Amino acid sequence: YNFNYKNTTLPKMYLTGDTTNMTHEQTVPMGIEYISPNEDKYGQSFNTGIQNNPVRIQGTSSLQYVRHNYTIFLKDEYGADMFYNPYGEGSVAENVFCLKADYIESSHANNTGMAKFINDCVYDTKTPMQSENPNCRTTINGFPIEVYINGEYMGVYNFNHDRYSTKSLGYDYKKYPNMLVYEINSNSNVSAGAFYKYG
C-alpha cells in the first residue's frame, strides 16, 4: 500500500484531458506534468501547462489488457517539439516516450531491465550513429514511474523510450540510406508478413 499510494521515491506523471476518442491510432491532446523526486536520477520536473501534447494507446497484443501502454509526444507552449532527457548520460534528448504498463510482467524487469542490460553490458558493436554520438542506444532506456490520468491512479509504469524515439536509436534514413529498421505488427504473429519496414 505504501509503495503504491504513499511513495515519495518514484517519479510521478499526471496526464490531463479528454481520453474518450483515444485509440492506438488516434491521439488526443493532453496536459502533462512530470514530478521528479531526484533530478540526478530522473531528470528535471516539468509541466507543459496546456493540453497540447498528443497521447495515444501503444501496443499490439497488449491492447486487450485492462491497463494500456501510452505513447506521449512532448510539445512546448507554442506546439513545437519539446526535447527532454530524463535518463542522463547514456541517452539523448527525445520528444517521444512510452509509458509502459508491463501488465503481464509487473516486475518491470524483463522489458526495460533486460534492454538496459543488453545495451550496457552485452552488445558492444557500435552502430554508425553511436560512432558519432556514444549516447545513442541500440535498446530503450527507462525507469519505474507512477502514472495518473485525470487524477486516477493507473499504477506503476515504466517511463521508456518509445520505438519511435528516433534521436536515441539513430533512425536517420537520409544520413544512413542503407539502414534497415523493421517492426513486428503483433507479438503473436510469427509469419514473414509480420515484419514491415519502419518509416
Describe the role of every protein-language-model region.
Residues 1-199:
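Phosphate/dinucleotide-binding and metal-coordinating scaffold of catalytic cores
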